[in-house]
């Protein structure tokens, strides 16, 4: 994934030093796009190890509509715990907006599947996780926001759109805020996996995954890790094999996915900015 290393280098070379909500500080650019041909391998970063269970379980959790971390914790995925209440609640985050937008029964995922099957040339085949009604206040804690009925965090990956050409399904993600070192490799893998799943459900081949970022930043406490990653040579991409076709997009299980020949450099640890 040379494209991803080019992205990191571009931020380092062209970014502006900025403060941020977390107080950590960043080097930031505005606007960047990467394209991945899903026919040429699954875009899983190889210059460090990506924790595949976190990618898969989080996506299945989103698709379930859940906003409580219990399922994640039961599967040893703790990436959301910092923002959850003592009861594990995160408020109306991704899963709620995808499956029951604004609490009004609008299942955006089901609607996308139906449109892809019945109106594949539509330019309205998209899902929005951004709901201004529940965007949290930056003046209070995530847990206090949840108590007020808001999300613990606003969605970083805010909207994604689908497009069919030559019987191939492509997906474009718009990410308003992009943690280049920790978050973006994860997001690329997650939405590429979702594209494969929806393509299977709609009897389509996969096309491209296009990642579009708004505020793309490297946190100041990730610079050393980014330099280490840039020193590494990318390896061949793995391939994804889906072992069965469930009856719906909501019925996949972790065991349905096999990432074949995932060769990678060692993991690089870094602190998340809360």
UniProtKB/Swiss-Prot annotation:
* Pfam name, any one: Thymidylat_synt
One GO MF annotation is: thymidylate synthase activity
Q: Which SUPFAM superfamilies match?
A: Thymidylate synthase/dCMP hydroxymethylase (SSF55831)
Q: What class of enzyme is it?
A: transferase
Gene Ontology biological-process annotations: dTMP biosynthetic process; dTTP biosynthetic process; methylation
The annotated active site, in chain numbering, is 156
Q: What residues bind dUMP, as annotated?
A: 21, 123-124, 176-179, 187, 217-219
**Which pathway features in its UniProt record?**
Pyrimidine metabolism; dTTP biosynthesis
Task: Name the catalysed reactions.
Answer: dUMP + (6R)-5,10-methylene-5,6,7,8-tetrahydrofolate = 7,8-dihydrofolate + dTMP
- Does Methyltransferase appear among the keywords? yes
Keywords for the protein's UniProt record, in alphabetical order: Cytoplasm, Methyltransferase, Nucleotide biosynthesis, Transferase
Q: Which residues bind (6R)-5,10-methylene-5,6,7,8-tetrahydrofolate?
A: 51, 179, 273
- Which InterPro entries does this UniProt record tie to the protein? Thymidate_synth/dCMP_Mease, Thymidate_synth/dCMP_Mease_dom, Thymidate_synth/dCMP_Mease_sf, Thymidylate_synthase
Stretch forming the signal peptide? none
- Compartmental location: Cytoplasm
- The EC number of this protein is 2.1.1.45
Q: Which domain of life is it from?
A: Bacteria
A cellular component term, taken from the record's GO annotations: cytosol
**Disulfide cross-links:** none
Per the entry, what this protein does is: Catalyzes the reductive methylation of 2'-deoxyuridine-5'-monophosphate (dUMP) to 2'-deoxythymidine-5'-monophosphate (dTMP) while utilizing 5,10-methylenetetrahydrofolate (mTHF) as the methyl donor and reductant in the reaction, yielding dihydrofolate (DHF) as a by-product. This enzymatic reaction provides an intracellular de novo source of dTMP, an essential precursor for DNA biosynthesis.
Family statement drawn from the similarity comment of this UniProt entry: Belongs to the thymidylate synthase family. Bacterial-type ThyA subfamily.
Assembly and oligomerization: Homodimer.
Q: Can you name this protein?
A: Thymidylate synthase
What organism is this sequence from? Francisella philomiragia subsp. philomiragia (strain ATCC 25017 / CCUG 19701 / FSC 153 / O#319-036)
* Gene behind this protein: thyA
